[in-house]
Amino acid sequence: IINSAAKVGGIYANDTQGTSFLIENLKININILESIINLPKVSLINLGSSCIYPLNAPNPINENSFMGGILEPTNSPYAMAKLTAIELGKTLKKDYGHNIINIMPTNLYGPNDNFDDLNSHVIPGLISRMHQAKLKNERDFNIWGTGKPLREFLYVDDLAEAIKFISKEKINTDLINVGSGVEISIKELAEKIKLTIGFN
């Protein structure tokens, strides 16, 4: 079983809809994980999020930073729901012998992404807003923030390959980060999108 179900959104959506993000994601994870309790030994891959790591975790973030500090406030409700799923997976393994592996992908992008201005993640959000600015012949573009934060991105098909690989291997840990290993600043990312879109 692969659990990739989640209510997701970008920083604005997480910051303004925290209650909904927490409740909906708790419901999703509890419903799925509770449903396997009385089944024969189940193998389940649970997709989490890199936002489960502390705000001040050293980069590159590794699994040893898990539960090592305060979460980033704007998406802590989403992170708490994901942390609850990890803990529930541990108890299901201990109490019922199920094999639960939690994969923490970095920031994803790819086909069928959400390009809504207020609810998208960083790459589709920048693409959408910059494209709209170009169509309106606007000279300035606000990337939101300083542009200095570093982010790691992973193409969604690469995550699919990682899931296939992990599902076939004997894994002795219940928490695995999946990423590209390459970080880029938001400003550099915006510059790449600017060149691709042709925004002057």
Question: PLM features: residue spans?
Answer:
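NAD(P)H-binding glycine-rich loop region in Rossmannoid oxidoreductase-like domains
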Residues: 1-25
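Conserved Rossmann-fold NAD(P)-dependent oxidoreductase catalytic core, especially the SDR/UDP-sugar
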Residues: 3, 30-75, 101
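Structural signature of the Rossmann-like NAD(P)-dependent dehydrogenase/reductase core
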Residues: 3, 43-48, 101-107, 142-145, ...
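Conserved catalytic-core motifs of eukaryotic protein kinase domains, centered on the activation segment
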Residues: 11-19, 55-60, 112-115
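Hydrophobic positions on the long internal alpha-helix
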Residues: 28, 32-36, 88-89, 162, ...
